[in-house]
């Protein structure tokens, strides 16, 4: 609970919206709601995946960010060209902490920035020849790359360059997979369309290449981890549990993933989807074309991890189900010790979240395992099926906010007064300057992993370290304290 009744939260929403002109106020009102877990269809009370109001300080990203920054960028043995001006590639380089195994610049390229560095003359005369030359240079300088993706920035779509033709010609010439991705930033309303475009590019240019490959030896226990970007090593801590219960992870993508793993994914028996929002499209495609079932899972916190492990094991035979219970029993003392240590220090603390992807709902259980309560949550780029899932996880009369503006978020925080905020880098310093403990929940504030039982110990430590840091008791300047004491003495 927010500590406020349903009527009070509804009143708060209206108070915050009062500053807007009528048109903007009506639009934003549709994106804010008081949660009711009994509601089965979120569209009855909140809308999402709509264009942000011009002039409002949205926290969203663009389609290029969704494609290059999320889906394609972490594939380690491919070179991802930011085709356009230098800024987009530079500002999206290495920011998400997608861990990988490999030698950077030799057989892994995740943290490097490859750009066609568009200039004015390229806008005037087109950049197809420049792109072809760049691909040749990349092949000469980095011969161990296994493929190339061309991530289009805004000017490419505006001037009508034919990146598909260049990719086909150079791919045939070099006998290498070269994938054109039409992810210009102006497309769609957020980075969500970039995810979809990237999924479609995987479908059209990568999947199917090894369908006739008979050298791959399948087993009944082959799975693929999809939609885990290995931030801080998340995919590794998840993979440990799956392999301990007897499953074989043929592919994980895109964090620490390779193009070969993606090509082999149609041969697995089950696709395990962590980030539903960014990877449900390709999972549905593989279900339709190859008959591969898929399921969501949640490895944040022991309660949800155990639920997910059992749900995954139920898709296989009794031997896997038995090993699953053995894995759960093995790690039980470990996570119980974490709860015993940190729950007394965190019990009753209230959290507000504003993130993207899956986290606004997936991390709720991890906080609850520590005795904390999420009193407000929202997504940057959700669709209504995300809110359908979220409303069941949130308590009654808690606050939901879609594409929340900087102003709205600050005002909600001032009134609800959470003990902790989990959001992104753009919000971090605003709330820290307000004296509110904050965790950057896009890339784990240079920490992690947070997935699985191992990750839960780090998650709990980080929340305790943030909330119970003695610095929050020292925010008042010494001269302000002395002035206050003088006033008290004078009044006495």
Curated annotation (Swiss-Prot):
[8Fe-7S] cluster binds at residues 62, 88, 154. Binds 1 [8Fe-7S] cluster per heterodimer. Binds 1 [7Fe-Mo-9S-C-homocitryl] cluster per subunit. It catalyses: N2 + 8 reduced [2Fe-2S]-[ferredoxin] + 16 ATP + 16 H2O = H2 + 8 oxidized [2Fe-2S]-[ferredoxin] + 2 NH4(+) + 16 ADP + 16 phosphate + 6 H(+). [7Fe-Mo-9S-C-homocitryl] cluster binds at residues 275, 442. Nitrogenase holoenzyme is subject to 'conformational protection' by FeSII; under oxidizing conditions FeSII binds to the holoenzyme and reversibly protects it from oxidation. GO terms for molecular function: ATP binding; iron-sulfur cluster binding; metal ion binding; nitrogenase activity. InterPro entries: Nase/OxRdtase_comp1, Nase_comp1_asu, Nase_comp1_CS, Nase_Mo-Fe_asu. PROSITE patterns: NITROGENASE_1_1, NITROGENASE_1_2. Changing residue 195 to Q: No nitrogenase activity. GO terms for cellular component: molybdenum-iron nitrogenase complex. NCBIfam families: N2-ase-Ialpha, nifD. Belongs to the NifD/NifK/NifE/NifN family. This is Nitrogenase molybdenum-iron protein alpha chain. It comes from Azotobacter vinelandii.
